[in-house]
């Protein structure tokens, strides 16, 4: 039924070498596949096996989605066999109208790869229409004077069928006067005419009736009949004559309706009524009669409607001129319509990909489309283009067919979709154009790894946090879509190994929130680092890592711990012995405490809560040093007790207490007989209550206090100045031991810690100083020489040298040298007031020495001075010895039983006397005994 390029391709031996390349070049190398079918085929009739003619197997029909497309779809493809089937009624006369060659053009589309083939179906005419006369009754007139051979034109019948199925012949019934002649024009049209065979006699027969039959060439033939009535009239011997037998004119299709088109003219040599000519359309299609109008008197032809070259290119009509005597003649009028560029091109999308992967290579076909312009010639030639700033371009695959292909890399994250506007422009003057926009969606692939908001994270978490609390949150973003952009978080590494990371922290896979699995302890874990990973769910998965450093902040959760004084092995408290001759400022002992916290939470301060003799001792706020605030008086007990509180700097502060037992004696033998008779000291809480009662009583006797004050003022005026000086409030005692001038200074080789039971019945008697101390702060002496000074001013110091007691400065053997000072470098002067350490190194040095001092004080193994119970520091606890876990404390180093501070032992080994503070040092000539 039809030929195909595929069949010819298989026939060529050389083309077999390139079976895979032929589908790409098929549209340009082969002629269209042609089929020929008769019209009016039933629906479902097989036109041909399109798959076979394309060289496709039965499996390829569905796999490659073989289909056809056209403006009016009259055909379809069987999805199983690949047959081209009739889908709708095919009427050649309706589809092609008056065209003799009727063809339907289709496009066969296949995918994988995407391609298109041209198919032409020729519609063959069948004899489905019978001839038809415009008028069933034909009336003619003829003069009786008409000679034999006169011809009368008859209206021909019409048949929409073509070729052999069109009108083939005409017949009339037999009669003696007329015969039928068929005239064939140059275009093949057949026109019947009656020929007069013999003269007429109107008087004999005034009219003649004939039957005209039109036959087509079909098998079987179809026919139509018309009744002819001929009236015989009087003589009119000259018929009209046209100036031309054929009129031809060309008109623009843009000619407005009502415009004059053509005027036909005919002349008649007769006179009178026989010369009056009227014009009529004859043998003209009804569509032509609707398009044009003819003035019967003038012969002027005008258009009733606008022309459209795309619908009808040429009009043909016959005009008859008839005179008043009934004679007539005909002429042919041909009107050709000239094409104007009045139709814009059309863009028809035949195939379009729904989505394009963003990793599609350049040259991938994403759409097929064709153009159509109903104009003719250059007006119908179309060229297409698109925007130049998009990664696509157009290829012309064949006449009026185009491919839209990729021309660069696609990135969905930057441009998720493209609105491609195709512009088609014809070559007319002026050119006309049209556009068609299509939307191309870019499908996502997993080409972007997650990205964290920060390059690293640092969070601060206070210790003792509740387990399960969130401590941080990391966030990452992924511009991909769906699973490619869905992020999960996890912990992949940490510096807690080999500890179980999961027992410390966890992370929410969905939100990135980091939770603490336990309460952190700053003293055990101050900081740790985690490596978090963000991973998407694409295939393959992509990930990114980020570091998270967690700093555990300190809280005041550890109370101070007193290292000295400590209880003995039997639970009894140690006693510190104080010489009876101790002057104000004498260093009695030192409270040493540590705090496991850090920072301000470990900044310790020392306070006296209770004292058996208030005002006798002073306590350094930061150093914890216990010094004599005044000289021992006659009424002061030999045994003294101090209750000291150690507070840290936290909020709220935590504290610890320590009890100091002090004994005034010059040697141990002096106090041993009386220790058993010493009454037991009252309970600290009871004494505190007692003082509260006394304070309340004092408030009630304010008047009595006023009297006492008046008596005191009177006594001041009556007593000698020397006696009053003991009560002078301006007395300042030099810090450090006061030694009478008949003694020489030197280092003590021994010191004592005396433990005395509470059942003693005796106590040491010391000389009490009547000078009260008006400050409970640390005593700092700057000018006092350690003796009673009259209140007359500094000039008495030079005028009465015999009243001054010379006192050597403290022995520097017990002081730190500059190189041995803990903390900062030796060139920097330390702060003697207990200020906070400047750096971690200072803290570690002090912590090491404090622990060493405390350890030796506890076990009585002091090596400094050689005496048992001395909390001295040996050379191994110098500044180079560090302990990382001991908290920071400065100045809390004390040597019990001594009024000296640490010194460099090197000077002692070299036999050099330490330099005194004021140059009045005497060499010791005596050796102290225990």
UniProtKB/Swiss-Prot annotation:
Glycosylation sites recorded in the entry for this protein: 304, 419, 545
Membrane topology: Single-pass type I membrane protein
Sorted UniProt keywords: Calcium, Cell adhesion, Cell membrane, Glycoprotein, Membrane, Repeat, Signal, Transmembrane, Transmembrane helix
Record-annotated membrane-spanning stretches: 692-712
CDD domains for the chain: Cadherin_repeat
Residue runs in coiled coils: none
Topological domains annotated Cytoplasmic: 713-930
GO cellular component: plasma membrane
GO molecular function terms attached to this record: calcium ion binding
Function statement: Potential calcium-dependent cell-adhesion protein. May be involved in the establishment and maintenance of specific neuronal connections in the brain.
PANTHER family listed in its UniProt record: CADHERIN-87A, PROTOCADHERIN GAMMA-B6
Protein name: Protocadherin gamma-B6
